[in-house]
Amino acid sequence: MAAVVQNVVKLLGEQYYRDAMEQCHNYNARLCAERSVRLPFLDSQTGVAQSNCYIWMEKRHRGPGLAAGQLYSYPARRWRKKRRAHPPEDPRLSFPSIKPDTDQTLKKEGLISQDGSSLEALLRTDPLEKRSLPDPRMDDDSLGEFPVTNSRARKRILEPDDFLDDLDDEDYEEDTPKRRGKGKAKGKGVGGARKKLDAAILEDRDKPYACDNSYKQKHSLKPPDRVCGKRYKNRPGLSYHYAHSHLAEEEGDDKDDSQPPTPVSQRSEEQKSKKGPDGLALPNNYCDFCLGDSKINKKTGQPEELVSCSDCGRSGHPSCLQFTPVMMAAVKTYRWQCIECKCCNICGTSENDDQLLFCDDCDRGYHMYCLTPPMSEPPEGSWSCHLCLDLLKEKASIYQNQNNS
């Protein structure tokens, strides 16, 4: 190292090297000053309590170099552990005051010396009026004001500025052992069973979402006509279904309040007439993506047929849905569902939607664990279900993807 320094000094010059060292020192001083504002602190990444130390020296500490190649030398300082005074005892934990007759008895028995010993000092306490509870805000530094009552000479309690590196990792740890895992053992029982029951009730209520026409039952004095029973995997689908299926009925009921009630048979026929063929929801006449209709697609400007969901009635242009020509022909052959209402074609449920795998030829949904054989991860590229493989043969998307690759 000394040879390297000598080579640098010879190459750049001693004055240039000194200036570079001064600039480096000034930069480090500014950096350390900024860091010292936040000291001490607990490093969240390493979990180590960062405190000040003796690494950083001042200019006044410099001395001449002692070895070859040394420009400066600094005095070595011995590491010293900070002395901690015992905190004042809580008066509530002290011994009760002793009556005079008891004091005389103890002196006779020899428990208390006549000249006053440490035992007498421990047994004697002040009245409760003169006691004051210790301030919890006191730290170890403020304990220097308390006198030392033992026979030893009084020692000065050092301040943090005297020893900057006294704070170490152990200072931030508690000395008392912690009892883990025992405090909450008694909480199990009725409370735990009640929490499990509440969680089960919430899960049954919200997952999956069922349409029971609750708005009409809560805010209308008339008895409910029927319960819809439609189920959805999330709230947006249920809200959309309610807005397009039941809200119009409630508005119609508000208008007909002044008219005599219609028979139940006629009312049920009117409700059935609002449903499409095979009990399907009436489709919307506009696209949810571009807000166009079958006469014009606002993205392309061309007329395009709408594809509607059989459960909620949402509609969309095939180009807005990014359908392929094969998929456009396939969705007309079965009860197509939008992404909000999509269910597994095998088990018929919409749970675990993160496990749903969609066919690239017909847009049907399948749980990966419902397939035969089951799949653990979605395949790369296109995927075709067994129905499309039997129908399209080699024209299926899975084979087209393999041919292109």
Swiss-Prot record:
GO cellular component: cytoplasm; nBAF complex
Segments for region (Disordered): 80-147, 165-194, 210-230, 248-280
Gene3D superfamilies given in the database record: Zinc/RING finger domain, C3HC4 (zinc finger)
UniProt key word Repeat: yes
Comp. bias (Basic and acidic residues): 100-110, 126-140, 267-277
Positions of C2H2-type zinc fingers: 209-246
Keywords for the protein's UniProt record, in alphabetical order: Apoptosis, Cytoplasm, Metal-binding, Nucleus, Repeat, Transcription, Transcription regulation, Zinc, Zinc-finger
Family per record: Belongs to the requiem/DPF family.
This protein's name: Zinc finger protein ubi-d4
